[in-house]
Amino acid sequence: MSDKLSIEDNIKNTFLNTNSALFEEPENLLKQEVREPALYNAIITAIATGASRMSEISGKVGESTNICSAYVKNLISLGIIEKETPYGEKASRKAIYSIADNMFRFWYRFVPENNSIIARGAADLAYKRIEPYLSDYMGKVFEEICKQYLWKQLLSGECPVEFSSLGRWW
């Protein structure tokens, strides 16, 4: 990544270039951490493409919720997936799962579905297909930046509002 390049060029050079170190990085990292990467890949892909509840994840993956739950717990312990509950609630049936790591979230959301195009060296076409969805992807990134900023302001004594935790509600 380079701050001298546009977002488009950075994405093309890193994620849409088969010669880039990041092109296969999430899959390679996962293979180092788990014994059965296929089901883990399927779960991460399901979450990256919109499944957020355990029933939705298991439906997309084609496995029972019990099996998926065990794999999701491992992904949580690896810091790849996170479980969120609505702000102010303890354990909740409203819990949702999301990809915690921005690189994993981007890669699993956009690279696999464009893999054939990328493999043929058509980074421009792949980017053209990705670009309309970048603002959706950046929504969660922006939320996280805002949370980090608020915590920094609070800890430095510069936040006009007192709080002890931050979260989302749905």
Task: List each model region and its residues.
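A cross-kingdom feature that marks ATP-driven nucleic-acid transaction machinery
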Residues: 87, 95-170
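Interdomain hinge/linker elements that couple catalytic modules in large macromolecular machines
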Residues: 1-105, 109
